[in-house]
């Protein structure tokens, strides 16, 4: 059974989900019909290549946040773009506790970003949503780990149903 599942699995790019998030942000900001001034934000060096690729496909600017964790675990964030008045979409593959996104969202707002959104492919949200809710304007996430559609600052548009992409198997 395991080999059949592996052989018949489908690799999905998160690009289509990020594209849905960008379109939803454009609709919410009243910029439907053309892409608004959204800045894609990579939260760390590990995600930058993928986020840059998405930026090229969507014709959007990309900013890489540089995250440094010192020996005591304190995180310092630096970024190079002017974010004043921009809608910023942080893009990453996984959110566990959300501390990095909390810090990055706070830094973006301190630098006068208009709105801060978060897209993650897989959301554990092990520390809950309370801190993120204070900073992040909207979260987009698949339901690959957890269904977040019932929360106030998420919508069914922002929750991508991975069940649509899973093939049903009958074990004989």
Feature names for model-found ranges:
Residues 1-172:
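PRPP-associated nucleotide enzymes
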């Amino acid at each position: 059974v395991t080999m059949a599942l592996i052989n018949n699995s489908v690799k999905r790019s998160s690009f289509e989900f990020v594209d849905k998030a960008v379109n939803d942000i454009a609709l919410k900001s009243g910029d439907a019909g053309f892409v608004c001034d959204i800045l894609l934000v990579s939260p760390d060096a590990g995600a930058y290549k993928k986020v840059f690729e998405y930026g090229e496909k969507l014709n959007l600017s990309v900013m890489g946040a540089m995250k440094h964790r010192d020996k005591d675990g304190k995180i310092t964030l630096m970024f190079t773009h002017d974010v004043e008045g921009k809608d910023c979409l942080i893009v990453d593959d996984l959110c566990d506790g959300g501390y990095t996104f909390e810090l990055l969202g706070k830094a973006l707002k301190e630098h006068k970003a208009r709105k801060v959104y978060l897209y993650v492919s897989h959301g554990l949200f092990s520390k809950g949503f309370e801190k993120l809710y204070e900073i992040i304007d909207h979260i987009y996430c698949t339901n690959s780990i957890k269904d977040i559609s019932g929360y106030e600052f998420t919508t069914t548009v922002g929750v991508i149903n991975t069940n649509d992409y899973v093939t049903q198997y009958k074990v004989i």
